[in-house]
Structure formats: C-alpha cells, structure tokens
Amino acid sequence: MTEEQITKGIGGLIIVRDSIESALALPRSYGVDDIPLVLTDRDFSTSNQFTMVPYGDSMLTNMTLRAQYQVPAQVVRFRILNGAIERSYNLGFSDGRSFSIITSDGGLLNAPVSVTKYILHAGERIEILVNCSGQSGTSVDLKAYNSLLAGNVAGGENFNNGPFANYLGKKDFNILHLNIGAQTANAITTIPKTLITNILLNSANANITRKLTISDSAGLPNIQGPNAFILNHKLFNINYNEYQVPLNNTEIWEITSSSAFGHPFHIHDVEFNIISVNGVAPTAAQAGWKDVVFIPGKTGGGPGNPGTPSVVKFIAKFDDYADALHPFMYHCHISLHEDEGMMGQFVVTNQNAVADLKNTDILVSLYPNPTNNKLYIEFKNQNQSAYYITITDVLGRTKVMLPKPELLNGIDVSHLSKGIYHLTIIENNSKQTTTKTFVVN
C-alpha cells in the first residue's frame, strides 16, 4: 500500500519554523534562496503513466523531469527530502564544490558540516547551504553520484533484468540543473560558523536497552519469499505490539542486522540520537536529532560463513503522546520492504494517568445547543481533554473526525445540514468515551 501511495504522489514536506531558527542568518525567502526539493524516481508506461516498481528509470525533482531552477548569486538553502520508493542518492555537485549540511531529520545541527558528497537514504531529510556568491551567469548541476554506492545500498545495484532492473542503477545522473542569476537585495553571502546548541541524550540515563534484529527471510517457514526482510524474526502483525514503553522512558535501541542489504530504519513518535554504527560514533552530519538511521548490510559471508552482522545503537526519550490504545510504528523506509511486512509497533503507556482517571466519569457539556455555526465543548474536570472527536448523523455516517482537536475556538459545524448529530469524545488520558447529542438548526 505504501509503495502504491508514494508512486501516486502522496508525500511531501512540512516546513516547521521557530524563533530560534528565525534568529539565525539563514536564507528564508521561499522559492528564491530557500527552496524545497523532493527527490524521487519513476518508471513510465507506454501510455505515460507511472508504473509501480521499486526503481524508476527517470529522475524527478519536485515531480519534474529534467528539472532546472534559477537561483541568485548568494547563499542558497535547499531543504531536501528523499521521497523515493527505494533509491538512495549520493548527493554532490558537478564541479565538486563543497556544500554545508545544517540539519538532520529533526532539526538544526550545532554547526554547518562541509562535505562534497552525502548519501541521503529513503525517508531522510537534510537542509544544505550552497554558496553561489560571485557566480552570476554560470550554472552547476546537483547530481547523484550513485556509481560510488556499494552494491548492497539501494541504488547501487546493477540488475540487467527482473523487477529491480532500471536505467539509473549504479549510475551517476542529474537531479537539478541550477542557473545562477543576479544577487538579490539583503542577500546572505556567508555561511555561519555555528547554529544552535543541541542538548543530546546521555546513554548513562537510559532505563533499558532494547535489542532488535533485521534478517533475510530465506529459509524461514511461513515468510513470503526470499526477497522479504523481517524485523525481530517476524512479519508485521497489526494486532501485536512488540513493546510497551513507559512514558518518559529513556531507551537505547540496539539493532543487529544479519541482512546482506542495507535498510533505512525509521521510528515514529520520537527523534533520537545515534550512539554508534558498528562501534563508530556518528559523523558530525549525523550527530543531531534523527528519526531515520541507515543500518548497513552485514560484512563478509558466503558458503558456511554467515558474515559479520552490523550493529547500530540510538537513544530516544519517549516523553509525550502516551496512548495505550493506538500504537506507533517502526519500519524500514524502503516502501517495498515496509509493504512486505518489515515493520513492528509499540505503545507508549502512562500508567499513572490511567490509574488516576480510569474510574473518573467524563463530564462534558456542549453549547450552544442547538447551533448553526460553532459548537463549544467544556470539560467539568480540568484534568481532562479531548484525544479524538467524531461527529456522526442519525444514520451512523461519520461527518467529522478530529484527532487531538483544538477546542478553544469551538468546532465549526456550519457545513452540516440541519438535523440531529452525535458527538463522541475519546478522553485524552483515560481513553474512555462519552457521546453527546446536539442539533444543527
């Protein structure tokens, strides 16, 4: 399902801004010197429609073939998402210039990190600064130097036939052609030396170390085919939660992979800090807040020799969004692998809140009732709040669904036809439900 949805274009960026970032001397004129880039590739049918395959033959940048853009002769910021179904991109510029990485998945780094190449795996995000000062009238290409990728990294394979064969495999290719124009007013012309101070998690404060495994499915009974990859020796089961994580737990997750292939591992709910990859501390560009980490394939191996597994450790604090009913996912960010069952789930539980509130009635009032515009909700217990609200009509048809609703300004029901409706609230802490009736006149 995920592969199909991504193929059809369901994927993009949300740009989050705050007062700390806005105080820095960074480009932020959207579309001028602050440019989002979603990288992906597609295969086209003879009728010019997307086909659902792991690798495409054509590079698309912001869903544009042979993309090009004009940028000013100054420092330009690119916010880049690898939105590919499977492929990693070894980013670099055609003239070998350096560029500065200023963020990882979860926000700003302590300082810009200057590189000439950077491998961005599926689902990962970075922001980079490129200094084009004094280069008006010239051009340069952002490229994928995928001929340099190892054969067990997505995009580094070179299959001539079969479902993974593609024109771009193990090749270098253009991502974006940049035409450099005139400098703008109030241009940023230098890259800052420092950014912010991240306070990272301390391994000594971990409450537990959880050990996960990644493996190939070959030879295992009841697992689909030799091309499937699995987490913790099982396929995904929507009715099974692998872990119950207490709210406010600080945890080390240690992932050991005997898979020959590398996998970008993604976790929902939290941002984490990488502790080590095969015993080595993360690079400066990987030392910030992350939610995707690349788990390398094992090294060595052959007949009678299983090879040496790779081991990646990260640390995270699960300090919000406790919900014993609705789990969070962790999975490979290669969509095909995820769809084949390379995924697990966990719940974050707040036992104190449940114990305090499980026997507490949900006392709530709706006003004005009847209404034809806004409907306001008031909890009698100030410690209670809405986790989820559903509005249905008298036939049971769902008309409104509001996860984590903001209730201060009321719920707009002006679009509802005149009649009787039922509003069901799931309370945020106890997860108990209550239903109230209101009238739209």
Task: List each language-model region with its residue ranges.
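A glycine-anchored, Pro-Gly-centered beta-turn/N-cap motif
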Residues: 74, 249, 326, 331, ...
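Acidic-aromatic/histidine active-site loop/patch
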Residues: 30-75, 79-85
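Beta-strand-rich interaction surfaces with strong enrichment in secreted/lumenal proteins
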Residues: 66-68, 114-118, 240-243, 290-305
